[in-house]
Amino acid sequence: STWVLASFPIPVRSICKIMSMKAVRNNRLGSALSWSIRAKDAAFATLISDRFLREYCERGTFSDLDLIDNLGPSILLSDRLTFLGKYREFHRKYGEKKFFAAAKLLLMLMTARIAPCSFWMTLLTDALPLLEHKEVIFSADQTYELMKCLEDVMAAEPKKENLQDDDAEIMKVEMLRLALARNLARAIIKEGTLDEL
């Protein structure tokens, strides 16, 4: 298989691209991603990664978890694929109750700017349970970073001409601001207490 790929790179890649496009048309995202990785087609891998992320936003779950969990070095094919793999890793850490590691990864996804801007509000919403956790998960500095990310999201959103703003979005932003403020207060108290010891 490796010999074939090395001997005939252009025809093999073309076949892989065709198979990837066919899989997308049949709405088989896992297969499409696998073929685009074999073709080393970064642009198409990015497109498919975006489809996975849209599907996650619509359904609240990922399809083809086994593939996403085992991307290996191919995760570096495109920034969006890297984000998809790392975002899935965040969910895995959270599910395993490794909250500090999950929080650190979530913050890295936002501050490294590999997350698509359209996905930032989803990431901030994912931070809510960690911000509201009985134990302080985000430090004061990390909370300030999240606050800056929220303000960046709000500044980037176009001002709606319609007076009837999306109530759900407004509620989400207010919940985030409240959770961030509470977490900041708890983190400052905790860190101040630790400094005194």
Across the structure, where does each feature detected by a protein language model lie?
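Extended alpha-helical solenoid/arm regions of large eukaryotic scaffolding proteins
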Residues: 1-197
